[in-house]
Amino acid sequence: MRLRNGTVATALVFVTSFLTLSWYTTWQNGKEKLIAYQREFLALKERLRVAEHRISQRSSELNTIVQQFRRAGAETNGSKTALSTISDNTIKLLKELTSKKSLRVPSIYYHLPHLLQNERSLQPAVQIGSGRTGVSIVMGIPTVKREVKSYLVETLHSLIDNLYPEEKLDCVIVVFIGETDLDYVHSVVANLEKEFSREISSGLLEIISPPESYYPDLTNLKETFGDSKERVRWRTKQNLDYCFLMMYAQEKGIYYIQLEDDIIVKQNYFNTIKNFALQLSSEEWMILEFSQLGFIGKMFQAPDLALVVEFILMFYKEKPIDWLLDHILWVKVCNPEKDAKHCDRQKANLRIRFRPSLFQHVGLHSSLSGKIQKLTDKDYMKPLLLKVHVNPPAEVSTSLKVYQGHTLEKTYMGEDFFWAITPTAGDYILFKFDKPVNVESYLFHSGNQEHPGDILLNTTVDVLPLKSDSLEISKETKDKRLEDGYFRIGKFEYGVAEGIVDPGLNPISAFRLSVIQNSAVWAILNEIHIKKVTS
């Protein structure tokens, strides 16, 4: 009898374990499918947004055509000879369109009037590839003749060899040869066709070069910022090269990432970039940075490229590209009546840095004649000590003593982790929003890989509603109100605090982390995510 009972018990344990395992497997598979569906939905949403922008662009182009017809009509002055080849319906339509006295909008020809001298000035002189469109990411690589060594082939191998087969179908790499010597251009093309024939025929790799008529006269440029005439010419031409490449790439995909011809990449870089961008699809970012060096690894949304190109063309003679990019952000969000810190906070929401870096600069000999540049990205090999999120613009402060420049401001802007000496009761970390925010959830993570024991203990999460009185909240939430008007909504457990914000508390004016007991260890804050309610 005991044996039978034991057998039954064993069978029950086996069946229970099997059912539990089956349930967990089903739940896990369902969770993975849900995440995959969410990513597909975000990708579709981005494609629709880009399509809407391109429809608007086409409308603008049609308006430009109307203006050209108006000018042509004025020049011919109604000449019967000029109109003899056009149908009556077309003439009637053109008269209706051109009869409106609309103002003329400045175009690329205003900044580069020499382009009007040749109708092919904005058409590639050389164009190799199948013209792939509809991809997620377009990678742009400008290259010019180098006196000592070319790194282009090694760069392309690094980019292509680190792509999975399905990723090779979802991107296009555009090599821009910024030279007008066609013999040299054709020699580069021949070399790339020999080395990457499969990638070119499949549509993954394209090669273009500009016509000589694209470039203005670069011999009499004003020397600025202490740069030599040669360097001013080099950086001016570089700005024009970037613009041509961006104009060519803008209709090929959802995102455009600027690379250089002397870099290497990390494994899984494509998936990392794409997922990071999709996570931020509800945010109004303008630049995602995947390297801290110059213009390497800077990614834009395709609809923003027109603005970027137009801004660069307005000042292409004045400053180098990285300065101009910073000026675009300043113009968009900085208030001249506010201080530099406020401006930096605003720009940090448009220019978001991903860490660790995915691209490393390896070129020693610059494309500028005689220049040696030993530039390397120090974040390329670093372990991930900070996880970056986009948070609402806020003024941050703390009573904690900061260790070696690991400030709270840098953490909130995604530049570095926060590190403070032993917290004591009464210490705080405060995030005061520039404008009240409707918050959905929060996550604060302390400690990191190098110092896992430096975590926040005995610390609470408090929020300050815009209106502490007359809130429509539950009795349970009301009981969490503190004397200073804050509400205690959570606490750190094992170094982590996360939770959902009661919608009745919104909008929120501030978040505060309050230390309620002395700590025996230092504290690192390596992740801050105050997630806004998505509309």
Swiss-Prot record:
Modification Phosphoserine occurs at: 474
Regulation: Inhibited by UDP.
Full protein name: Alpha-1,3-mannosyl-glycoprotein 4-beta-N-acetylglucosaminyltransferase A
Coiled-coil stretches: 28-63
Signal peptide as annotated in the record: none
Chief location of this protein within or outside the cell: Golgi
Subcellular location: Golgi apparatus membrane
InterPro entries assigned to the protein according to its UniProt record, in alphabetical order: Glyco_transf_54 (IPR006759), MGAT4_A/B/C_C (IPR056576)
Assigned keywords, A-Z: Coiled coil, Glycoprotein, Glycosyltransferase, Golgi apparatus, Membrane, Metal-binding, Phosphoprotein, Secreted, Signal-anchor, Transferase, Transmembrane, Transmembrane helix
Topology feature Cytoplasmic, residues: 1-6
Function: Glycosyltransferase that catalyze the transfer of GlcNAc from UDP-GlcNAc to the GlcNAcbeta1-2Manalpha1-3 arm of the core structure of N-linked glycans through a beta1-4 linkage and participates in the production of tri- and tetra-antennary N-linked sugar chains. Involved in glucose transport by mediating SLC2A2/GLUT2 glycosylation, thereby controlling cell-surface expression of SLC2A2 in pancreatic beta cells.
Record PTM text: N-glycosylated.
Single Gene Ontology BP annotation: glyoxylate metabolic process
Mutant lacking the gene: phenotype: Mice display impaired beta cell glucose transport and insulin secretion causing type 2 diabete. This is due to defects in SLC2A2/Glut-2 glycosylation, provoking SLC2A2/Glut-2 endocytosis with redistribution into endosomes and lysosomes.
Transmembrane annotation, as ranges: 7-27
Organism: Mus musculus (Mouse)
Lumenal side: 28-535
Any Gene Ontology CC annotation: peroxisome
